[in-house]
Amino acid sequence: MELKDYYAIMGVKPTDDLKTIKTAYRRLARKYHPDVSKEPDAEARFKEVAEAWEVLSDEQRRAEYDQLWQHRNDPQFNRQFQQHEGQPYNAEDFDDIFSSIFGQHGRHSHHRHAARGHDIEIEVAVFLEETLEEHQRTISYSVPVYNAFGLVEREIPKTLNVKIPAGVSNGQRIRLKGQGTPGENGGPNGDLWLVIHIAPHPLFDIVNQDLEVVLPLAPWEAALGAKVSVPTLKERILLTIPPGSQAGQRLRIKGKGLASKKHTGDLYAIIKIVMPPKPDEKTAALWQQLADAQSSFDPRQQWGKA
C-alpha cells in the first residue's frame, strides 16, 4: 500500500493555503454527499475526501503528512505503513512510522512496570438528520499490537456496536473506555475515542446550534406576502412571508435547529429573490405598469454594502 496523495484527492496543490483547501473540501463533500450524488462510488469518495480534510485542515498533521510524503519511498517506511492498510490517518500510528524512519526510539522500550495502553481515535461521519435522535452504529477499527521497541507488529480487527447520542456536534469526542490498545504488564487498556464529523448538507448550513437555509421567492411573493413550504430536518412546514420582504432578510423558525441537552437552536430562512425568465410581451407590459406606478421609487437613493 502507498501513502494516499491527499492533495490529489482534494484537487489542490501542496502549496495551497487552508482557505483554498477548505473551498475544495466543501465543493467535493457536496458533490459526493450520498443524499445528492448518483455516482456508484459516491460514499467511498465522500469518506476519502473527509479523510483528506481531517489531515490537511490540521496544521500539525499536515506538516507530519508532508514529511511522511517526502519519505514515502523509504523501504522501512513502506514496511510500517503497510500494517495500517485501510485505516484513516491517525497521528499516533504515524508516530511509530516516524520512529522507524528517523531512528528515534519508540514510546514503549524495555520498561517492565505496568503501562497504560494507547488511545485510539477514529472519525465517525454523521448526517444532520441523524443528530435528532440517538442511534446505533457499527464501528470497525483495528487495534495495533506493539513490540518491545514500540513499533507496530500487527493489528487486530475489532467491531463494536455503539450508541451515538442525540445532539452530537461537529468535533465532539465520545469516549469508549478500555476499547483502545491493551495495557502492558497488567496496565489498563487505552480508550477508543469517536470523533464526530457532521457531514455537509446539500440544503442546510450550521451556525452553532442554528441552521440556515436559502429560501427562493418570486418578486410578487416577497412584495405581497405568501405562505410557502420550507424544508426542515424533520418535515416541511408552511412559513408565512410578510409583505414587503427583502432579499437577504432572515426569517426565524423557532426550535427547528439542532438540539443539545441544554438548548435547541432555530432555523433561519434567508430570502433570495428569483426573477422569472425573460418576459414575453404581455408580461413585459405588466412590469412596465408596475414601473410607472412606482416611478418615484429609487432603489439607489442610498448606497451601501450588500
Swiss-Prot record:
| One GO biological process term | protein refolding
Q: GO cellular component annotations, sorted alphabetically?
A: cytoplasm; nucleoid
The J domain covers 5-69
Provide the alphabetized UniProt keywords.
Chaperone, Cytoplasm, DNA-binding
User: What GO molecular function terms would the record report?
Assistant: bent DNA binding; unfolded protein binding
Q: What is its main location?
A: cytoplasm
Q: Which PROSITE patterns match?
A: DNAJ_1, DNAJ_2
One of its Pfam families is: DnaJ
Places the protein is found: Cytoplasm, Nucleoid
Organism domain of life: Bacteria
Q: Which InterPro entries match?
A: DNA-bd_curved-DNA, DnaJ_C, DnaJ_domain, DnaJ_domain_CS, HSP40/DnaJ_pept-bd, J_dom_sf
Record function comment: DNA-binding protein that preferentially recognizes a curved DNA sequence. It is probably a functional analog of DnaJ; displays overlapping activities with DnaJ, but functions under different conditions, probably acting as a molecular chaperone in an adaptive response to environmental stresses other than heat shock. Lacks autonomous chaperone activity; binds native substrates and targets them for recognition by DnaK. Its activity is inhibited by the binding of CbpM.
- The protein's name is Curved DNA-binding protein
Give the source species.
Salmonella typhimurium (strain LT2 / SGSC1412 / ATCC 700720)
